[in-house]
C-alpha cells in the first residue's frame, strides 16, 4: 500500500519512519475501510519523539492490519453504528425495534432458578443429555397400541370399603325376659314374624306391619323356656319349665296340642319337617312326630347334664347337640347312638350352627370358661378351625350371603361380632357393643339382612348387618312341606 506524494513503500506488517515528515492526505473522500483504520489508530496510545519535533510517532499494530482487512465476503462493510438484527432457527429475521424485548427474553436465567426448576422436574443439571445410561426396564406385558386405543376411558374404580352399622336400626322393649344362659327365648320365622318369650307369656311381632300380639300364656306354676318356628312359619313350638311342649297355630292364634315326655324343663327345640326334637335339663333328647297321636318316636341319651343347644342340618340327615357337660354330639338321623362325640370345649356348649353353603360344616361355641369357637367336619369328625372369641359365646349364626359367621357374646364384652371364614382361619370384621349386659338370644331375618338380639337389659334390638352388594335375592318361601302336616 502506498501513501500519496511519496514513492517509498510501507510494509503492511511493520515500518519505522526515517525522516521527520508530516502526513498529509489529499482532499479525497475517505473510504469506510480507511475510516476504520483511522479509528483504530486514534484509540491507541501515542508518544512524542522530542520537544523539537511536532511529529507524533505512531507504531502500527498488527490488529490494525486485522481491522483493515476484515472485509465481508460480499457487499459493503457493515456499519458499526447500526445494530445487527437477531435471528434463530425458528425466526429467520426479527425487526430491529424488538431487539430489546428479544434480548430480555434470551438473557441468561439465574442459576438459582434453573436449579429449582431442575429439582422440581427431577433431573440433574450436571447430567449430560446424551450420556450413556442403562436401558429402561421392560414392561411386564407387551404394549399393544390397538388395545390401548380401544380401551374405554373410564376412571379406575376401587371397591368401596364395607361399612358396618354400629347402632341398632330398631329397639323394642322386652320387660321380664329371663336372664338364663341355658334358655332359648327368641326366634324369627320365614314369614317375617318374631317370637319372644317374656316369663310366662309369648308375644309375636310382625316385622312387615309392626303389629304385636300375645300368642300364649302359661300357668303360674311354670314359665316359657324355649320357642322355635316351623320351617314355613305356620306353627310355633313352645317348651315349658315343667317339661311340656306346646304347639300353636299362629294364624288362628290357638294351641293345637301339648306333648309330654320330659321330666325337666325343655330349654331347646329344633324342627326337621314334621319331626320336632326337644332337649331337656335331664340330658335327654326326644323326637316328636307331630302328625300322630303317639308323638314320641325316639329318644337320644348322650348328655349327662342339661341340653342347651340343638340344631338339625338343613337336609335332615344329622342332628347336633350341645350340653352343660361341655360335650358336642353329632347324631345320624336313623341312629340313637352318636356318630361323633367332641369334648374339646371347657364350658357349656349352647351355640350350635350348621353352615348353609357347606352342609357338613358345623360350628360350636363354648361358655365363660372356654370362649372358643370350633369348626367340625361332620363327615369325618375332624376339627378344621378354631378361634378364641375372647368372651362367652351365646349364639352362632351363619350368613346366607357370604362366607361369614356372626357370634353373640356374654361376659366380659357383651358384643356382637362378624367373622370372615376361610379354610385357613377366621378374620374378625367388626365388634359391635350390642347390650349393657350379656347377649343371650339372637335370630336372623328370613332375608338374612337383619339380626335381632335380646339381653337381660330388657331390650330387643335389630341390627342391619348386611346390605347393598353383600345381599343376594332371598329364596322364595313356600308352604308345601309343613302345610301337609296334620297336627293332632
From Swiss-Prot:
Which SMART domains does this UniProt record tie to the protein? WD40
Matching PROSITE patterns:
WD_REPEATS_1, WD_REPEATS_2, WD_REPEATS_REGION
Ranges for the region named Disordered are 1-29, 74-93
Sections of the chain in a coiled coil: none
Gene Ontology BP annotations = anaphase-promoting complex-dependent catabolic process; cell division; metaphase/anaphase transition of meiosis I; metaphase/anaphase transition of meiosis II; mitotic spindle assembly checkpoint signaling; positive regulation of anaphase-promoting complex-dependent catabolic process; positive regulation of mitotic metaphase/anaphase transition
Q: Name one GO cellular component term.
A: anaphase-promoting complex
Q: Which UniProt keywords apply?
A: Cell cycle, Cell division, Mitosis, Repeat, WD repeat
Ranges of the WD repeats in the UniProt entry: 178-215, 219-258, 261-298, 302-341, 344-386, 388-429, 434-473
Q: Where is the composition biased (Low complexity)?
A: 7-17
Q: Which InterPro entries match?
A: Cdc20/Fizzy, WD40/YVTN_repeat-like_dom_sf, WD40_CDC20-Fz, WD40_repeat_CS, WD40_repeat_dom_sf, WD40_rpt
Task: Supply one GO molecular-function term.
Answer: ubiquitin ligase activator activity
Q: Which domain of life is it from?
A: Eukaryota
Q: How does this chain assemble? A: Interacts with cdc13, mad3 and mes1.
By sequence similarity, the record places it as follows:
Belongs to the WD repeat CDC20/Fizzy family.
User: Function of this protein?
Assistant: Required for mad2-dependent spindle checkpoint activation. Promotes ubiquitin-dependent degradation of cdc13 by the anaphase promoting complex/cyclosome (APC/C).
Record-given protein name: WD repeat-containing protein slp1
User: Which species is this UniProt entry from?
Assistant: Schizosaccharomyces pombe (strain 972 / ATCC 24843)
The major lineage groups are: Eukaryota, Fungi, Dikarya, Ascomycota, Taphrinomycotina
Amino acid at each position: 500500500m502506498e501513501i500519496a506524494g511519496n514513492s517509498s513503500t510501507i510494509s503492511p506488517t511493520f515500518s519505522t519512519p526515517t525522516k521527520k515528515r508530516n502526513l498529509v492526505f489529499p482532499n479525497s473522500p475517505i473510504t469506510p475501510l480507511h475510516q476504520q483504520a483511522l479509528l483504530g489508530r486514534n484509540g491507541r496510545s501515542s508518544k512524542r519523539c522530542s520537544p523539537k519535533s511536532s511529529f507524533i510517532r505512531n507504531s502500527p499494530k498488527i490488529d490494525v492490519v486485522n481491522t483493515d482487512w476484515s472485509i465481508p465476503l460480499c457487499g459493503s462493510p457493515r456499519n458499526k453504528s447500526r445494530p445487527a438484527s437477531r435471528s434463530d432457527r425458528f425466526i429467520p429475521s426479527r425487526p430491529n425495534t424488538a431487539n430489546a424485548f428479544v434480548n430480555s427474553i434470551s438473557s441468561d436465567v439465574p442459576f438459582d432458578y434453573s436449579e429449582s426448576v431442575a429439582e422440581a422436574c427431577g433431573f440433574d443439571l450436571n447430567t449430560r443429555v446424551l450420556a450413556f445410561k442403562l436401558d429402561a426396564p421392560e414392561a411386564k406385558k407387551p404394549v399393544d397400541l390397538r388395545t390401548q386405543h380401544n380401551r374405554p376411558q373410564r376412571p379406575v374404580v376401587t371397591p368401596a370399603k364395607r361399612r358396618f352399622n354400629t347402632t341398632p336400626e330398631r329397639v323394642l322393649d322386652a320387660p321380664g325376659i329371663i336372664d338364663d344362659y341355658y334358655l332359648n327365648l327368641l326366634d324369627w320365622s320365614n314369614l317375617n314374624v318374631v317370637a319372644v318369650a317374656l316369663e310366662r307369656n309369648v308375644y309375636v311381632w310382625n316385622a312387615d306391619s309392626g303389629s304385636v300380639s300375645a300368642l300364649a300364656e302359661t300357668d303360674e306354676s311354670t314359665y316359657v323356656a324355649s320357642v322355635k318356628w316351623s320351617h314355613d312359619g305356620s306353627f310355633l313350638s313352645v317348651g315349658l319349665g315343667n317339661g311340656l311342649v306346646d304347639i300353636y297355630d299362629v294364624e288362628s292364634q290357638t294351641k293345637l296340642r301339648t306333648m309330654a315326655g320330659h321330666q325337666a324343663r325343655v330349654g331347646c327345640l329344633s324342627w326337621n319337617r314334621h319331626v320336632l326334637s326337644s332337649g331337656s335339663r335331664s340330658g335327654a333328647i326326644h323326637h316328636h312326630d307331630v302328625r300322630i297321636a303317639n308323638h314320641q318316636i325316639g329318644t337320644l341319651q348322650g348328655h349327662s347334664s342339661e341340653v342347651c343347644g340343638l340344631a338339625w342340618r338343613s337336609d335332615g340327615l344329622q342332628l347336633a347337640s350341645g350340653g352343660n357337660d361341655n360335650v358336642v354330639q353329632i347324631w345320624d338321623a336313623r341312629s340313637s347312638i352318636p356318630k361323633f362325640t367332641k369334648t374339646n370345649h371347657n364350658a357349656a356348649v349352647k351355640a350350635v350352627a350348621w353352615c348353609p353353603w357347606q352342609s357338613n360344616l358345623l360350628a360350636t361355641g363354648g361358655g365363660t370358661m372356654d370362649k372358643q369357637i370350633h369348626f367340625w367336619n361332620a363327615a369325618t369328625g375332624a376339627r378344621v378351625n378354631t378361634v378364641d372369641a375372647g368372651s362367652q359365646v351365646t349364639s352362632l349364626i351363619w350368613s346366607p350371603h357370604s362366607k361369614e359367621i356372626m357370634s353373640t357374646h356374654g361376659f366380659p364384652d357383651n358384643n356382637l361380632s362378624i367373622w370372615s371364614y376361610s379354610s385357613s382361619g377366621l378374620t374378625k370384621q367388626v365388634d359391635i357393643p350390642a347390650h349393657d349386659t350379656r347377649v343371650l338370644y339372637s335370630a336372623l331375618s328370613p332375608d338374612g339382612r337383619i339380626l335381632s338380639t335380646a339381653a337381660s337389659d330388657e331390650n330387643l334390638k335389630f341390627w342391619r348387618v348386611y346390605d347393598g352388594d353383600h345381599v343376594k335375592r332371598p329364596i322364595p318361601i313356600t308352604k308345601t312341606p309343613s302345610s301337609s302336616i296334620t297336627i293332632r
